[in-house]
From Swiss-Prot:
Cofactor binding: number and manner: Binds 1 zinc ion per subunit.
GO molecular function terms noted in the UniProt entry: metal ion binding; rRNA binding; structural constituent of ribosome
Name of one Pfam family that matches: Ribosomal_L31
Cofactors, names only: Zn(2+)
Alphabetical list of PANTHER family matching this protein: 50S RIBOSOMAL PROTEIN L31, CHLOROPLASTIC, LARGE RIBOSOMAL SUBUNIT PROTEIN BL31C
Source organism of the structure: Frankia casuarinae (strain DSM 45818 / CECT 9043 / HFP020203 / CcI3)
Highest taxon above the source species: Bacteria
NCBIfam families membership: L31 (TIGR00105), PRK00019.1 (NF000612), PRK00528.1 (NF001809)
Residues annotated for Zn(2+) binding in this entry: 16, 18, 38, 41
Protein name: Large ribosomal subunit protein bL31
Length: 78
């Protein structure tokens, strides 16, 4: 390897919002990384799926555009 080409790695502490911390190496100089999810709290790794509220989106769409019936024309020709 060429000298002075690669960045220096620093020991870094990663802190998740769930409270989990672990140490790794990174090029970030201050040695602290904050993460939103980690393997201890991510639904894929824990097996707990979070249910997303899509009902609110449907209601918002129906308020904006109204509820259409099958066969009803939408708008007229200009």
């Amino acid at each position: 390897m060429k000298p002075d080409v690669h960045p220096t790695y620093h020991e870094t502490t990663v802190t998740c919002t769930c409270g989990n911390t672990f140490t790794t190496r990174s090029t970030k100089e201050n040695g602290v990384v904050n993460a939103e999810v980690c393997s201890q709290c991510h639904p894929f790794y824990t097996g707990k799926q979070k249910i997303l509220d899509v009902g609110g989106r449907v209601e918002k769409f129906e308020r904006r555009f109204g509820r259409r019936r099958p066969g009803e024309k939408v708008g007229g020709a200009k």
